[in-house]
A protein has these predicted regions:
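Acidic, metal/ion-coordinating pockets
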Residues: 1-133
Length: 133
């Protein structure tokens, strides 16, 4: 199974790291969505079965970003951070599953996902938090 991971962070994170090695920055989710589209389209020659966005832009911005993604790009999942949101359930926007696992080191998020590799999409999933002892 081929999995594509794409990272999205806020301009604030870039400014705080002051790292010249970071490539690209996004002022808004429209710019981020356009960049995700370019990355996904650049990998069209590879049979990508599953695409994950790892973000640090906040839960509501994750939802907003998902609404702007073209379903043809094949983004399946957003695992986010920044706002430290702990939703009771993962949410779906525009066919993209989204979750965060709260803040600190109290818990981690766990997805169990069945992928339909014939159609390159999520067949089923469960999401929950797992306490860290």
């Amino acid at each position: 199974m081929n999995i594509l991971f794409i990272g999205i962070i806020t301009q604030d994170v870039i400014n705080q790291t002051k790292s010249e090695s970071l490539v690209g920055s996004f002022v808004d989710t429209a710019a981020a969505a356009a960049e995700v589209g370019k990355i996904c389209n650049a990998h069209n020659s590879i049979d990508i079965d599953f695409t994950v966005l790892l973000t640090h832009i906040g839960f509501e911005e994750d939802r907003h970003l998902a609404r702007q993604l073209d379903p043809a790009w094949g983004v399946d999942l957003i695992i986010g951070g920044h706002s430290h949101t702990l939703p009771e359930h993962a949410v779906e926007e525009n066919g993209v599953v989204i979750a965060q696992a709260g803040t600190g080191t109290d818990q981690i998020g766990r997805f169990d996902i069945i992928v339909d590799t014939d159609n390159n999409c999520i067949d089923s999933y469960t999401w929950r938090t797992v306490p860290i002892c």
